[in-house]
């Protein structure tokens, strides 16, 4: 089936050279200056890594706090022991429960974006792992969503912490903000993602780690980023 592209997509596509790599700020400004959609589009980054994810030591899963936030409200759910439920409810969390929430998930309830829990509840949550896992909602110590300091985790995810992981092709797909962010704020968030991926390089990754990086918005074509320029910016760019 032939995919029909919108008029604004074609306009942006005509401004982008498939062969040309753009400096990060140039790519951001080009995407921001294109025809506007009827909603606030999300800026996305797609990081192609030289990882064979069929091996466990080449799988990447981590989290990062975007210094300028995500631009979207994250609906947080917390599973904890019965004694803590009321305290966490008073902390401003959307959904809080214990074994009852696990049971609700088993029955199909998934109306949240991020699930946090404490280590003692993981054996209970494991029962719904087959439901949460494929949706990217299974808590993990690596991503900071399984922690003894649940209150700090709640604050971090509210501020703009997000999880990322490689897909089967070794690509990390993440957001870096909204189209109405300033170019500088989007660049700050992009550098934060890049740094985090470097810092969490899997032990099994040998030789060249990065292949390519692409930026796009929800409704735009992708722009290939000049990775060398991004590395130069990373050395000098302050996260204000």
Curated annotation (Swiss-Prot):
Binds directly to 23S rRNA. Might be involved in E site tRNA release (Potential). HAMAP family: Ribosomal_uL1_B (MF_01318_B). GO terms for cellular component: chloroplast; large ribosomal subunit. The lineage of its organism: Eukaryota, Rhodophyta, Bangiophyceae, Cyanidiales, Cyanidiaceae. One of its GO terms (molecular function) is rRNA binding. Keywords: Chloroplast, Plastid, Ribonucleoprotein, Ribosomal protein, RNA-binding, rRNA-binding. PROSITE patterns: RIBOSOMAL_L1. Part of the 50S ribosomal subunit. The gene is rpl1. Belongs to the universal ribosomal protein uL1 family. It is found in: Plastid, Chloroplast. This is Large ribosomal subunit protein uL1c. It comes from Cyanidium caldarium. InterPro entries: Ribosom_uL1_bac-type, Ribosomal_uL1, Ribosomal_uL1-like, Ribosomal_uL1/biogenesis, Ribosomal_uL1_3-a/b-sand, Ribosomal_uL1_CS. One of its GO terms (biological process) is translation.
